[in-house]
């Protein structure tokens, strides 16, 4: 192992030294008189400045232009640009490397000292340093053909806000409205003056006014004046209106007059659109507080009841306007949505707005095709294909009916351990209704920007494990999905029924399948809650939480008083499963800079079978290993506990457990542009049984479960094409829980030069999407 590591380290060092040597010679490609701009250094000389490091960082980041990017000290993109040379044609490899991979040199002539002095002055004043002294110089080295900039800054004292005044003396109703929310100001006494805070406070005021009828107001009509007349480091801030620049409409509060929904809008160029949208042969159908305009009744008027958030007579509200648009979008029935607001006055001079929502229906019917292929390390390949048909408005209320036919196979083309080929075919139907069916039974919050939905699902799947068993499953579900807010989602399925029928073949004795066989009915509710802070916008730290509660047979068990010592109770002639299952998936994402990310996940899950069941149905149990689990172990062949197939003469098809604990950490960093990322990861965890199984010794969960933790690590690539993420991971075991005490950690046995070691330990995972 040491020899292979030394060779690998030596080759890596040699390649890096060669790249650095080449990078240092980039200036030889410059024309006579040209220099390469290497960047600028900013030094804040005020020793008393508490924010010295912060100032140097933000000021250095403000200087323009930016020098050529460096990766571990090497201007890699500039080197590739120079290596490629001048393209001889508009196509070809040379052109691609130069334009797509490479980066043109940033020349010294593009660096303007005086312009950057002004940039730094503005940046300092925007952060409360109103009277700085900036000394700059430029260093041109004609011999090395390089240019550098140097800025020495005496920031001076920083000014803090003493008093904040909101339009005192202004007697207009608009000014009074602004003063009403002065207590919610983002500008606080004693805080340093920050232009960003002033701009944010203007936006806060604008948002409030737009939600109280002031349709024509703009934050640009507000100006913050600063008085630095005192000899102290305190200033007074006066928020004022630019009254002389504001049109009369700005001071008026508008109310809603009428609301119209046009479901036949044609989105074209301006000229064509006007002609296409003339309201010929259209009916205007009044319904409650709005009217629907359409040629024929493609959509029932009641559809828009939960979407339209304002009523005639209400003060105009930007928030409710956006909420209406978002709810119309979430109906998933329209490909184009546009709102128009027209101002008018009533006979008394009251300012009014007429709202028109123009909707272009999406094609009502659509076909979809999906295909996928995969390869696994245990010499297995597979493929899946599905064909779907969707109707987006099956009952004229934006109800969506989707029917999907799918099929696939998985087979072995080699390898020491032979497993049977698998075949699957299935039919699924899904009806989605944009409202809560029987909604009066549930008290849920549906005031978010997303229309709550009800789902009715019906499906059948047939699985054939060649020479071992065949499996038939029928499922029916009735449930609800709604969003409490943009980052909180609930899924409640009070009715979930799955019927499972498994038949084994006579020659199935080659494999032990009792641990994956279940015959009977799974009946009970499920509830899932998801929180995702990433949806709300970019933050340095984001959180994700997904919790699931899955119950089966509990009400039936209470009614029938089930007892494990007796034969299982039946319903419709079939035994039913009785269990409680809970699982949580918690993730933390920490960003460094603009693109680097540290992703972490903790998964905890447990299922307990009781009453009418001795063990959990296999389709509800947990497994470990694979592309989204412990990536250094093969999928479904890790655990339970310290058990391993090498310790048993039994031939297992897969290994499952009742408890799962797993922790993952992964650091992602761009390798090229934004679409190619590299990753280094470590995974740890395992699965366990709650009840002893003599065929899997060591598989039961005990107080010493830590001894059974498996650990793997590796490297990966992520090809992020926005709409698709292709992931390649190479993992290997670092700790094998089935090994003898003192030998479980296998890091010191790593031997990349050994073919047999690589075949046994390197696991290649090809997958779609990030693992977490």
Predicted segments, located by residue:
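Interaction-mediating elements
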Residues: 2, 25-330, 339, 446
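Bacterial N-terminal signal peptides that target proteins for export
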Residues: 2-11
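C-terminal motif of bacterial Sec signal peptides marking the signal peptidase cleavage site
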Residues: 20-23
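Strand-connecting loop/turn motifs
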Residues: 129, 214, 232, 364, ...
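C-terminal outer-membrane beta-barrel translocator/porin domains of Gram-negative envelope proteins
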Residues: 277, 374-378, 491-671, 675, ...
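Gram-negative/organellar outer-membrane beta-barrel architecture
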Residues: 297-298, 317-546, 631-632, 638, ...
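One-face residue pattern on beta-strands with alternating periodicity enriched for small/polar residues
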Residues: 384-390, 426-430, 457, 477, ...
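C-terminal beta-signal and adjacent terminal beta-strands/loops
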Residues: 684-700, 723, 731-753
């Amino acid at each position: 192992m040491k020899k292979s590591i030394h060779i690998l380290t030596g080759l890596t060092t040699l390649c890096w030294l060669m790249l650095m040597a080449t990078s240092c010679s980039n200036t030889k490609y410059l024309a006579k008189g040209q220099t390469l701009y290497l960047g600028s250094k900013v030094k804040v000389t005020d020793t008393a400045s508490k924010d010295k490091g912060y100032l140097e960082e933000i000021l250095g980041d403000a200087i323009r232009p930016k020098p050529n990017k460096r990766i571990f000290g090497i201007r890699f993109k500039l080197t590739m640009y120079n290596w490629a040379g001048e393209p001889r044609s508009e196509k070809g490899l040379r052109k691609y490397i130069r334009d797509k991979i490479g980066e043109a040199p940033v020349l010294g002539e593009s660096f303007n000292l005086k312009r950057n002095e002004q940039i730094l002055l503005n940046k300092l004043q925007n952060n409360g340093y109103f009277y700085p002294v900036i000394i700059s110089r430029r260093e041109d080295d004609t011999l090395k053909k390089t240019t550098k900039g140097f800025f020495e800054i005496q920031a001076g004292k920083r000014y803090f806000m003493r008093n904040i005044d909101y339009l005192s003396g202004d007697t207009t109703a608009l000014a009074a409205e602004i003063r009403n929310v002065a207590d919610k100001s983002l500008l606080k006494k004693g805080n340093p003056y920050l232009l960003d805070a002033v701009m944010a406070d203007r936006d806060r005021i604008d948002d409030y006014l737009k939600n109280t009828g002031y349709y024509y107001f703009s934050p640009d009509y507000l100006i913050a004046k600063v008085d630095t007349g005192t000899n102290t480091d305190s200033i007074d801030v006066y928020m004022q209106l630019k009254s002389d620049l504001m049109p009369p409409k700005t001071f008026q509060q508008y109310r809603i007059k009428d609301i119209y929904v046009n479901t036949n809008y044609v989105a074209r160029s301006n000229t064509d659109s006007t002609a296409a949208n003339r309201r010929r042969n259209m009916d205007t159908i009044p319904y409650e507080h709005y009217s629907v305009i359409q040629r024929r009744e493609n959509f029932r008027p009641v559809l828009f009841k939960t979407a339209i958030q304002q009523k005639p007579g209400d003060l105009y509200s930007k928030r409710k306007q956006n909420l209406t648009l978002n709810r119309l979008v979430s109906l998933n029935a329209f490909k184009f949505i546009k709102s128009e607001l027209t101002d008018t006055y009533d006979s008394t001079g009251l300012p009014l707005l007429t709202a028109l929502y123009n909707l272009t229906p999406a094609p009502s019917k659509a076909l979809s095709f999906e295909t996928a292929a995969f390869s696994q390390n245990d010499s297995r390949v597979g493929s899946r294909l599905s064909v779907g048909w969707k109707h987006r408005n099956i009952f004229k209320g934006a109800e969506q009916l989707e029917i999907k036919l799918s099929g696939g196979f998985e087979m072995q083309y080699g390898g020491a351990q032979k497993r049977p080929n698998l075949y699957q075919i299935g039919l699924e139907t899904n009806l989605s209704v944009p409202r809560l069916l029987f909604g009066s039974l549930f008290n849920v919050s549906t005031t978010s920007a997303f229309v709550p939905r009800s789902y009715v699902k019906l499906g059948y799947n047939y699985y054939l494990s060649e020479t071992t068993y065949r499996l038939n499953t029928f499922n029916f579900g009735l449930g609800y999905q709604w969003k409490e807010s943009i980052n909180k989602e609930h899924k409640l399925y009070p009715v979930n029924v799955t019927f499972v029928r498994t038949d084994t073949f006579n020659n199935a004795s080659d494999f032990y399948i009792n641990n994956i066989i279940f015959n009977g009915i799974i009946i009970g509710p499920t509830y899932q809650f998801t929180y995702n802070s990433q949806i709300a916008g970019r933050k340095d730290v984001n959180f994700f939480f997904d919790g699931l509660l899955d119950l089966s047979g509990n009400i039936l068990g209470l009614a029938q008083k089930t007892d494990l010592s007796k034969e299982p109770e039946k319903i419709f002639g079939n035994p039913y499963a009785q269990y409680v299952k809970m699982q949580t998936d918690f993730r933390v994402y920490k960003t460094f800079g603009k693109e680097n990310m540290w992703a972490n996940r903790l998964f905890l899950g447990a299922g307990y079978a009781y009453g009418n069941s001795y063990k959990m149905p296999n389709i509800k149990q947990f497994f470990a290993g694979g592309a989204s689990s412990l990536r250094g172990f093969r999928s479904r062949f890790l655990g339970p506990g310290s058990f391993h197939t090498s310790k048993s003469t039994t031939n297992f098809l897969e290994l499952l457990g009742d408890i799962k604990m797993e922790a993952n950490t992964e650091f992602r960093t761009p390798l090229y542009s934004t679409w190619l990322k590299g990753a280094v990861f470590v995974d740890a965890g395992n699965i366990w049984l709650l009840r002893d199984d003599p065929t899997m010794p060591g598989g039961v969960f005990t107080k010493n479960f830590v001894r059974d933790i498996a650990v793997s690590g590796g490297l990966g690539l992520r090809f992020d094409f926005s709409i698709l993420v292709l992931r390649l991971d190479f993992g290997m075991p670092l700790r094998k829980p089935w090994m003898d005490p003192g030998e479980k950690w296998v890091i010191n046995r790593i031997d990349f030069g050994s073919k047999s070691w690589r075949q046994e330990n390197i696991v290649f995972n090809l997958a779609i999407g990030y693992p977490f």
